[in-house]
């Protein structure tokens, strides 16, 4: 970044912002990059600002312990500068009130009785022009200074909130949703940036009104208050319209949220949507919601339109009501008329715009400050103190809960019970109504391990394994008992966390660098081969969340980070997730057992082979210690431990049915305490009154729940995953929006708060920060492609040598040469690479083609043109009124002069005769009435048509996205796509229609005023032409740079929130490693990068505003002197010319800003058009109409063979020379694969992590760019439509897709099957008993991706879809990866019966799941080898033989089992299910 010229700029350059000219010229000539942006001033750096505010906040907390106020800390930091710029702003506003006085004196000097003052008219004109210059020199620096202070306040509070976030306790994090936190940083704090300039008008506007009313009293006496009274009534009317608009906005919020939730789910699971051929069904569902949303959008738009148009047309009535009473009583002069008009313009702005906006700004700002103040006082994390004298880790009778403390609970309970009129004397009331709060996650835990021992912790999902580790780290505070441990802790989380940076930086993580230790850890964690394949080895830069890595690679890097740190205690929470058998066994042996042999280790695992090698085994069951001791003691004392470990005693229907009790605990109550109490007390599915009978929603079963139910107030719908309080309309109205353009994976997508589609309960699953920390957000589907497109940075490449583990890597003395501290200073180039951004490279300005496509997108374009002409004629009628006044006023002047009317009290020309007065009065009233009739309603068709255009564009974009090839989604993030449906669609719905209307109206007002001025004084037209030309050239010159600066600001905005989300996901790791200062530095760097862009944008914008005003001042000087020099004795002509010139000056400047805003908003339209123009997959058979497509069955008649045959009939599959890549022309991921499958054959697909198993299944469905040929029952995929081909397959994907909607819709979105058929299939797959428990059964609405269902139940839903499809080929992608044994047995049973005649292709890591397969395909090096039996496979592939356990080998080789039958039998121990990331997501930690 370049050094800012502001530091060396002169006072003149700073006042006129001419120091920005170099960047403006550079942006006009070429494309700007981040390197072209100027460095920030040290006073604007996040470090300095946050330090100042933090110091003052700490002082406030120390001095006001009971009730510290954040606003007091802000005052001490920014008050005096804020006051100084407020005074400048007031002085600038005062000049507006003085200008009409000089205008009146100029008009008066042209009266025939004041000819002696004619000579001073030029001096008065010079004074009037000087007032414009003074106003310009006062207002623009004041506005810029206030924007600057607002920016500094936002930065300081940004940093303060981030620092506080890193200190929050886990209990607090469990109560705060990610959306609330991001909304606090984005929507709320943005109000300071530009809103602060309006804050002073809360006192400036009243003073302005007092001054103006005093001056108007001097002119019109009491009649002046008539106009003021009208303005006050108008303000109240606008306030009423504002409340109506908020009502429509609130109603619309639910529909917008519903649409975005389903849209995000579709985008997130687009591969499943295409595999199921659900594109048309999903499009119909979303368009139905969109129709209801647009009805409310139109109502809100009409109200906003009337609110806006009322301001434009109020000017006539203010002048009319002020002048007419005075005219009727005393008569009036033209000087008074024109002076009153000028005063009324200023008065109208102060009363109807400035003061209400200022009040709203203070209301919003104080609300935000109170929110932040409350946030800063929340409970902080307290690290567990350790005893250096002890050498062991021990727990004595430890209990803990993620809920509130017992004391807090009873205080709240008493308050709630008293509020509900329940007797305090009944102690059972507490436990019957509030049992949810006190259920501990851990109870009476006792164990002790000595230094150097390995403790293995096992248990079922939700047993409390991770909570136990959190308690050792201090994240969970024990409610009873004692914990002892010594020294430093290293931690490997179950959800692998990757920070933005190189692979080496992720592993070293700020610890002193030792090459020998580093290489040893790399080898032990099986990372050598993976790193060697990266283009820059371990210096490859990893993006957000490790998006360029596979799940297994992320898990191994996360483990390597923990192992590299020299600690006294290592906490390893299920570190082997998503690892294949061979890799898992090697890492456990070489790393956990050998490399860390002398360290104290606590390993969470459920593998029996690993339990055997542990020194001690601790088995948890429902939060209690089920067993503690050695493994041999476990076999002797608890031979049935395997079933307890898994969490299911029996596989009978009753036990399977009780699973629903567990899965229904995943909602948090979102209502008032009384609702909570009634919900718990009744223990029933209570519905609200206005439910319809067709749709049901989520339920809450609170019985026996050990999960957290938090009492929360209702929040607004969450938008774009990060906004829970503000709607997109509000977002679009701000010039600055810190909502990230590219959100991070799944965490960025909106979570379902509620769906107003029918019955709903007052419950929802809250996406808390703690949930975010215990889940993964990176889709596994695009790993292979993303790896090949990793952003890299060139650094020195380490040589990897074969390191032995003979030496203890932790006890070596490090030489000075080998120590390398990770620097706290982060280079901006590194920052750009760490936070990968896919922002489009758009042209600096919106092209005319975009405008043309936008206006012609709807058939009502001709009506838009007609109404534009109506607008023009109305403006001409308004301007013509002034000419009528002039023409009819001349006879009146002569009449009063000749008749020497005695009633005249002054010497000025006065309208007093009945003829002249009534004539002019009727003309004015007639013109005003026509303006009211034509003006107020003239824009409605325009607004209506533009909203219809938005509807058409949304429909086209949705269709294009759903039918785009998968290669589009492999190169585009889900967050970017969702932004088009949320942010950009909101702009089209809410802001763009009224912005276009305002711009059209302002331009025509200016044209009308210029026309009148030119007719009166033709010489003025000569001065108007160069002004208009200068305006057009200056606008074009500025737009080239400003739009690029906005793009750069948007790019710089994303890393701020990406870093926040990254920090939240890895917060436990950050605390365990003590790297909070490093991440604060990284956050400040991201803030500074954004500040540099935003400050430069504000500076260039202010330069543009000042330059325009300078041009207008020159124009007004020319108009003034031309009119004075050529007017002779006509005061009326001078008055009209100067009044309209002032009006032109204000209106044209407004129009310039409006044109820039419209151009900026049209960029959203341009982005939508680029999505509409996306390439389309092979088109569906166009000969069929839409109804036939929607109702089409999943079995097709083969038009290519015989009409009487059904295709597919057998399921025979032949693959010939199949090659595949993710994008056209990209690297080949599968090459020349050929094999054939017989009908009904079961085939197992094997391979290491990332070998391409899922890729091959995707290639079968034509989801990739493929070459070669596949035939099913003799029909080639090249001769059949794409959707027909896909419907030949039944699919159970690795990533389960449940969209928000009824169970019926999730099973049969096309509505083809009857209830009897659907219930029969659900019973067949084991879902019937669960569905029967839901109110409404098939009509029960699943929210938030089916949060009330376990992952196993979701798999069964997918299985039911496949059964309904009647497909002949079934593809299963890792179906047992996340399943409990019950669900796995159900799937195996269903495969035997429902798919007995089908060809089954099963992709699995575990050999146990493949025992029933007849053939096997092993993927190695992008090719496939076939094996006829698993025995042959194990014999030829030695690493498979090494990876499987002894018990599995007994299953695979029955001959070996018979030969060893004489040996002493031992209790059979089945392999324990490995916990995975998806299961952890379902636990409440």
From Swiss-Prot:
Residues 750-760 have a biased composition (Polar residues). Residues 1474-1485 have a biased composition (Acidic residues). The gene is cftr. NCBIfam families: CFTR_protein. Epithelial ion channel that plays an important role in the regulation of epithelial ion and water transport and fluid homeostasis. Mediates the transport of chloride ions across the cell membrane. Possesses an intrinsic ATPase activity and utilizes ATP to gate its channel; the passive flow of anions through the channel is gated by cycles of ATP binding and hydrolysis by the ATP-binding domains. The ion channel is also permeable to HCO(3)(-); selectivity depends on the extracellular chloride concentration. It comes from Xenopus laevis (African clawed frog). Residues 100-123, 218-223, 321-340, 882-923, 1017-1018, 1122-1135 are extracellular. It catalyses: ATP + H2O + closed Cl(-) channel = ADP + phosphate + open Cl(-) channel; chloride(in) = chloride(out); hydrogencarbonate(in) = hydrogencarbonate(out); ATP + H2O = ADP + phosphate + H(+). The lineage of its organism: Eukaryota, Metazoa, Chordata, Craniata, Vertebrata. This is Cystic fibrosis transmembrane conductance regulator. Phosphorylated; cAMP treatment promotes phosphorylation and activates the channel. Dephosphorylation decreases the ATPase activity (in vitro). Phosphorylation at PKA sites activates the channel. Phosphorylation at PKC sites enhances the response to phosphorylation by PKA. Keywords: ATP-binding, Cell membrane, Chloride, Chloride channel, Endoplasmic reticulum, Endosome, Glycoprotein, Ion channel, Ion transport, Isomerase, Membrane, Nucleotide-binding, Phosphoprotein, Repeat, Transmembrane, Transmembrane helix, Transport.
